[in-house]
Amino acid sequence: MKEIIARHKAGEHLGICSVCSAHPLVIESALLFDLNTDNKVLIEATSNQVNQFGGYTGMKPADFRDFVYGIAQEVGFPRERLILGGDHLGPNCWQNEPAAAAMEKSVELIKAYVAAGFSKIHLDASMSCADDPTPLDPMVVARRAAVLCKAAEGTANEEQKCHLTYVIGTEVPVPGGEASTIGSVHVTREVDAARTLETHQIAFRESGLEEALSRVIAIVVQPGVEFDHTQIIHYQPQAAQALSAWIKETPMVYEAHSTDYQTRQAYRALVRDHYAILKVGPALTFALREAIFALAQMENELISPEQRSRVLEVIDEVMLNEPGYWKKYYRPTWSQAMVDIHFSLSDRIRYYWPHPRIRQSVEKLIANLNNVTLPLGLISQFMPVQFERLSEGVLTPTPHNLIIDKIQDVLRAYRFGCTPDVA
């Protein structure tokens, strides 16, 4: 990370896409996408997804590391080009507990991530706990971040410290996605970004963390990009001009969250304006969902009814029977909720792919289609971009390859934004 930031600060148009997903096909897609380049691949886990208690994935930080390393080994991706990051590391998961208890767990969270070899650590203590006022005083936020930083510094060995980096600050949206419809987005004011940096500098120095300050590479801000279930707020560079100008006077860059679904040109403009770390998550699993839905349509055309996977029906049954991951996010009317379940940009379906019934039906879908030849006309009908790539000779039409390539459509847009002189 330090090299990428240094090159950006030296004037090179360079950024990095942060892949925020625990889905094995998404991770495989990202690693295969840069397998034959010299690029680093940044893969991040969030605190609610992976923590010392297992998170909603059931993985602790060391488990997630081994999970990613296992996929890397399968595809031949070198570990030295992998960067593992932890996002929103702090009291996020324990906001309903008193601050003292939540911070105690947050310290253990940080230790677990650093001990597992995660080198990009987002210190986020911005959320109020059960006995806190709302919002928290910025100095309290910074001092809590310093406590977390001290835990990281105390856990890392000297070799790890060569690569260890920190991200501070937070964006407006809650981790995990918007729960309601958005109308507009508040762009972070440069004075607030400056205050975030100043308070963290004071707090770190109070705690004897002067050396750790040199490892702070980025500040999380809101540049004016967001999405909800049905709409996207696109980047407007003119609205963030003052914010972009301020960061130039510091040794840091910005990290932008929720950049999913922006245009290729928007990613390029964001990196130009020093939002050099672009986080993406739901757009990747949305592309995965599109690919599986497309393959299900092909299966309906090619496989006899009694042998089909029924994957779309199984997804509906599971999500309707177990609505915990989508109920409070989607519209209450049944017909509208079904549209959201299938097609929402926030892609709450991503939480259900590990479900045993859904996983088995997806496996059967792929097995069924592996046993037949996929007609080019059928691929053109349901996956036209992949049809073009087949015609160009850069893709072989297996179900697995079609899914991977569909996910990589998203990554191609980020590469355009993050890389100098790309077509």
UniProtKB/Swiss-Prot annotation:
Keywords: Galactitol metabolism. Transmembrane segments: none annotated. One of its GO terms (biological process) is galactitol metabolic process. Pathway: Carbohydrate metabolism; D-tagatose 6-phosphate degradation; D-glyceraldehyde 3-phosphate and glycerone phosphate from D-tagatose 6-phosphate: step 2/2. GO terms for cellular component: plasma membrane. Component of the tagatose-1,6-bisphosphate aldolase GatYZ that is required for full activity and stability of the Y subunit. Could have a chaperone-like function for the proper and stable folding of GatY. When expressed alone, GatZ does not show any aldolase activity. Is involved in the catabolism of galactitol. Forms a complex with GatY. Belongs to the GatZ/KbaZ family. GatZ subfamily. NCBIfam families: agaZ_gatZ, PRK15052.1. This is D-tagatose-1,6-bisphosphate aldolase subunit GatZ. The gene is gatZ.
